[in-house]
Amino acid sequence: MYEILKVLNHNTILVLKENEEIIVMSKGIGFGKKQGENVDVPRNAKQYKMQKSYQAKQKSNNIFDYIDPMYIEISSEIITLTKERFGKVEHDILLSLADHIYFAVKRIKEKDFPSNPFNMDIQLMFPDEYSVALKAKDIIEKYTHEEINADEIAFITLHIHSAISVNKVGQSMEVMRVIREFFKKLQADLNIRIDANSLSYIRLMNHIKFLLLRLNNNEELQMDITEFTKEKFPFAYEQARVLCEQLSHVLHKDLPDSELGYLALHLERILSCTIIS
């Protein structure tokens, strides 16, 4: 038996079991129920354990004061899509995603449309997560009758990525910022224009995506071409070293030397097919 802490709506309740707070979602589970009552939870009910840290718990409880439970249902459907696409979801994003969608819809109603400067890079680095976010767009529209734009889809992509990796949304945004500012400076210094849709650029973004996975799994590339690229492509090597230092700073991890060599090779390919402005 679970003790009801709060009835959010007919289909969603917050319960306590063995000193653990859990959001339970099942059709009609909250109908006619009151705080303090005990309730049986169906075996097929969706359950989301609340974060245990004090700060996270306080934020979670505050969310219930202002957010329509409908947004928790939206978030739950998106998590289901994520599980279907990627398997197990490593981190619970139920409330953080619901909170983001709530404010996204609020901004739409207020005609406030913040831009996402990392939209294209997010699509290139996380195409699978982005495909789930596109489906999430339809779920949001089904519930709210509001259509989110491409920039918001990219933001939701980062939430989905954080659910299947150890990278939090803020950290992923920092990685995107570092990459964007690095190429902005490189283009200005060399008076060139880099095509973000080129195959070479897409390959670089894909390499960085798997670089992050290798870091998270404490894995290293088997072949080290660092000395080769240092001798063959000294300028690209030096630029790759700068990028590695910047990424290490935001990730709080040192990048192996083997990553430097491959980043240099990708940068050389990009630079070899750039257009002088």
Regions flagged by a language model, labelled:
Residues M1-S277:
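A cross-family "folded-core" feature that marks the main globular domain of proteins
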